[in-house]
C-alpha cells in the first residue's frame, strides 16, 4: 500500500462551520450574506468581495467552503462567469472533471474575451490530454491579448501537439511583439519547434540567444544541451563542456545540502550497516504511459522490498493505468509537480533517501536543480537521457559496456560510470500488443523499410544513407511515422527534404500517427526492416519494432547516444545487425532484404526478445540492486576515512 504525501486535498478541518446565507438587494446592487462561524454575526458583502473570499478558500484548497460561496453567488447571479468558472475548477480539482469542464466551458462562452478564463481552461484541457481543445483556448487568448507572451504559450502547445510549422510562426510573431529583453522564452519555443523539425543549426542558434537573454533559466539551458546530441557530426568534447557549464552555472546558484562534513558523518554513523534496507528514491515526470515508464515500471515491480524501500517522486499530475501500477509497486509515492526545487530537496532529505535516482537528465520537466542541491548522499542518473548531466553532485550514471565501452567515454562525464553486466535497461512490452503477422514483403512483393523515430534524429546524412539503401534494394519503400505527421505541411516539408537528398517520387511514405498504442504497434506488421537513426539512436522505438518481429539495422557510434542499438542488438545476440560505418550500414540493410532470411528471423524474434536480458526484469533488477549496494558500500568506506 503506497503512502501519499500529506498535501491538503479537501476542506481544512479547522475552517469555520458554515451556517447559512441569503441574498439582499441594496441600492440596486446585489449583495449576499456570507456564512460565518457558529455564534458570529453574519457578514453582508458585495458579489466581488464574496468572490474574493471564495477564491481565498480555493487557493488554500478549502474546496468545500469555496464551492459553497460560489454557489451562493450563482443563486443570485446565475450568469456570473467568474463564479461559474471557479466552481468548475473546484469540481475538477476534487475529482468531478466532466462537470467541472462543462462549467468552465460555459463561463468562457459567457465571457469569451476573458483572457484568464480561457488560459486556465486551456491548462485544464492540457492536463486531461485534450490538446485540440487546449490549443483552441490558447488561440482565443491570443485573439484578445496580443502582448506576445501568450504567443509563446501557444507555440509550446502547438509544438507538443506536433503542429511544428504553426508553432514556429507563433514563436516568430512573439519575437516581433515582445520587447528585446523579454524575448528569451520566444527564442526557446522557436528553437524547440525547429529541433523537432530537424532544423538543428537554426535551433541551436536560437537556444544560444535565449540563454544570453535569460542566463539563469535552467529549462532553456537543458533544452540547449539536449539538442546538441542530435547533431550529425557531433564534437563530443565540446558537447561535454556545454553540459559541464550547465552544472557549474546552476550548482553555484543553489545551497548544497551534503557539503557539511559533520552532517554527512552523522548520517553515515547512524546508517553504517552495509546490509541494512536501503531507501531508493526515483525522480521522474514519466511515471505514466511514456517511453521512460516502459523501462522503470518492470524494475519497480521487481525490486526486493525486503532490501529496498522505494520512494517515487512524481513530477506530473497526469494519472493513467501505468501510473496506478507503478504507484502500487512503490512503498511511498510523492506528487511533486507543485513543489519548488528547494522544498522538494528538503522533502527528499527528510525522507532519509540513501540513493536518489534521476530518470530525466536534460529532458522535459526534469528536476536537476534538486539534484544540484545534493539532498541524498548518493545521486545517480539513469535511462531518461543518453549523456552526462554535467552536475558534479551526480555521483553515477548507469550504463553498460556496449553503450559505453570501458575507457571510451569516461572523459565525457562528470559522473562515474556504473556499468551493468548485460544491458543498461529493461523493457516492458505492452500487454495488449498485436500478434506478429507474416512478413509483409511476401504479399507486397517488395521490401518495406521503416523508422518511427522523431525527425530531430533524421538528419540529411541519415536521409542520404537511407536513400542509398533504397537504391540497393530495387522496388523498396521507406515508411516514416511519428506524432508530427498529422498535417500536410509537415509531410510536404519532409518529402522535399528527402527529395533534396536524392529520393525519387514514391520511395518515401509518410504515415499519420495513431490514437491508440495497439494501432501504432500494428503498423509494424507492415514493416519488413527497421532502420535506426544515427548518431542519436532510437530506444523505445527499437524495442517496439523488435517486439513486433521487425529486425533493426543500427550503426555503432562513439558514445552512449549512438550506441544504444549496439547494446540492444548485442543483448539479443544479433551482432550481424550492427554496422561499423555508413557503407557497412547500407550493405547490412541490403543483405538483410532477403525474404527467406527475413521471414525466418521475424518468426522467432518476439520469443528471442522475450527471453533476452532486455526483458528479464527480475534478472536486470537484481543486477541493478547489486550496483546500488556497491555504491552504498563505496560511500560508507569514504565516510570512515
Feature annotation, model-predicted:
Residues 562-573:
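Short acidic/histidine- and often glycine-rich active-site loop of Leloir-type glycosyltransferases
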Residues 546-547, 570:
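Short alpha-helix at the nucleotide-sugar/activated-sugar donor binding site of glycosyltransferases
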Residues 1-446, 464, 492, 496-505, ...:
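Alpha-helical solenoid repeat scaffolds of the TPR/TPR-like class and their adjacent stem/linker regions
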Residues 363, 532-541, 555-563:
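Nucleotide-sugar-dependent
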Residues 283, 452-453, 481, 511:
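Short hydrophobic "strand-cap" motifs at the C-terminus of beta-strands
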Residues 307-309, 467-496, 500:
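A conserved nucleotide-sugar
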Residues 450-461:
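Substrate-binding clefts and catalytic carboxylate motifs of secreted carbohydrate-active enzymes
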Residues 82, 358, 452, 481, ...:
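Thr-Gly-centered strand-to-loop micro-motif
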Amino acid at each position: 500500500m503506497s503512502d501519499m504525501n500529506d498535501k491538503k486535498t479537501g476542506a481544512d478541518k479547522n475552517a469555520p462551520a458554515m451556517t447559512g446565507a441569503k441574498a439582499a438587494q441594496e441600492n440596486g446592487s446585489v449583495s449576499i450574506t456570507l456564512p460565518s462561524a457558529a455564534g458570529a454575526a453574519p457578514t453582508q458583502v458585495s458579489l466581488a468581495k464574496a468572490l474574493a473570499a471564495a477564491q481565498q478558500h480555493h487557493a488554500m484548497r478549502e474546496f468545500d467552503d469555496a464551492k459553497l460561496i460560489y454557489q451562493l453567488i450563482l443563486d443570485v447571479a446565475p450568469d456570473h462567469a467568474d463564479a461559474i468558472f471557479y466552481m468548475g475548477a473546484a469540481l475538477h480539482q476534487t475529482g468531478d472533471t466532466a462537470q467541472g469542464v462543462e462549467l468552465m466551458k460555459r463561463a468562457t462562452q459567457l465571457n469569451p474575451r476573458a483572457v484568464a478564463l480561457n488560459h486556465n481552461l486551456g491548462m485544464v484541457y492540457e492536463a486531461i490530454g485534450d490538446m485540440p481543445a487546449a490549443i483552441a483556448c490558447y488561440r482565443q487568448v491570443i485573439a484578445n491579448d496580443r502582448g506576445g507572451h501568450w504567443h509563446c504559450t501557444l507555440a509550446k502547445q502547438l509544438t507538443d501537439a506536433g503542429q511544428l510549422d504553426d508553432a514556429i510562426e507563433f514563436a516568430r510573431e512573439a519575437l516581433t511583439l515582445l520587447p528585446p529583453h523579454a524575448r528569451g522564452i520566444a527564442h526557446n519555443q522557436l528553437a524547440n519547434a525547429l529541433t523537432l523539425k530537424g532544423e538543428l543549426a537554426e535551433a541551436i542558434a536560437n537556444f544560444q540567444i535565449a540563454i544570453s537573454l535569460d542566463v539563469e533559466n535552467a529549462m532553456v539551458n537543458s533544452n540547449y544541451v539536449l539538442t546538441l546530441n542530435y547533431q550529425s557530426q557531433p564534437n563530443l568534447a565540446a558537447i561535454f563542456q556545454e553540459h559541464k557549464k550547465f552544472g557549474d552555472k546552476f550548482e553555484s546558484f543553489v545551497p548544497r545540502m551534503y557539503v557539511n562534513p559533520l552532517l554527512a558523518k552523522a548520517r553515515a554513523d547512524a546508517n553504517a550497516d552495509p546490509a541494512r534496507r536501503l531507501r531508493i528514491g526515483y525522480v521522474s515526470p514519466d511515471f505514466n504511459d511514456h517511453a521512460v515508464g516502459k523501462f522503470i515500471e518492470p524494475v519497480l515491480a521487481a525490486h526486493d522490498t525486503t532490501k529496498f524501500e522505494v520512494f517515487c517522486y512524481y513530477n506530473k499530475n497526469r494519472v493513467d493505468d501505468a501510473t496506478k501500477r507503478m504507484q502500487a509497486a512503490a512503498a511511498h509515492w510523492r506528487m511533486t509537480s507543485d513543489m519548488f526545487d528547494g522544498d522538494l530537496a528538503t522533502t527528499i532529505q527528510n525522507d532519509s533517501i540513501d540513493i536518489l535516482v534521476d530518470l530525466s537528465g536534460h529532458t522535459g520537466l526534469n528536476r536537476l536543480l534538486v539534484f544540484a542541491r545534493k539532498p541524498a548522499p548518493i545521486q545517480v542518473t539513469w535511462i531518461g537521457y543518453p549523456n552526462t548531466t554535467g552536475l558534479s553532485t551526480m555521483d553515477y550514471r548507469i550504463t553498460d559496456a556496449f553503450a559505453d565501452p570501458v575507457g571510451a567515454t569516461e572523459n565525457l562525464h562528470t559522473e562515474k560510470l556504473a556499468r551493468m553486466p548485460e544491458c543498461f535497461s529493461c523493457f516492458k512490452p505492452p500487454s495488449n500488443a498485436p500478434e506478429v503477422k507474416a512478413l509483409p514483403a511476401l504479399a507486397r512483393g517488395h521490401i518495406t523499410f521503416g523508422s518511427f523515430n522523431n525527425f530531430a534524429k533524421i538528419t540529411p546524412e541519415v536521409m542520404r544513407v537511407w536513400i542509398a539503401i533504397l537504391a540497393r534494394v530495387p522496388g523498396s519503400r521507406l515508411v516514416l511515422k511519428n506524432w508530427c505527421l498529422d498535417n500536410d505541411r509537415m509531410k510536404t516539408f519532409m518529402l522535399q527534404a528527402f527529395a533534396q537528398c536524392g529520393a525519387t517520387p514514391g520511395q518515401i511514405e509518410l504515415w499519420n500517427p495513431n490514437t491508440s498504442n495497439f494501432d501504432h504497434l500494428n503498423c509494424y506488421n507492415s514493416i519488413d526492416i527497421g532502420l535506426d537513426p544515427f548518431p542519436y539512436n532510437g530506444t523505445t522505438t527499437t524495442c517496439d519494432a523488435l517486439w513486433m518481429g521487425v529486425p533493426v539495422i543500427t550503426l555503432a557510434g562513439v558514445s552512449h547516444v549512438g550506441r544504444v542499438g549496439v547494446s540492444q542488438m548485442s543483448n539479443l545476440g544479433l551482432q550481424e545487425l550492427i554496422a561499423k560505418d555508413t557503407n557497412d550500414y547500407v550493405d547490412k540493410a541490403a543483405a538483410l532484404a532477403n525474404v527467406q532470411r527475413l521471414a525466418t528471423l521475424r518468426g522467432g524474434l518476439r520469443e528471442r526478445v522475450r527471453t533476452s536480458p532486455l526483458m528479464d526484469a527480475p534478472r536486470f533488477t537484481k543486477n541493478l540492486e547489486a550496483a546500488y549496494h556497491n555504491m552504498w558500500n563505496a560511500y560508507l568506506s569514504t565516510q570512515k576515512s
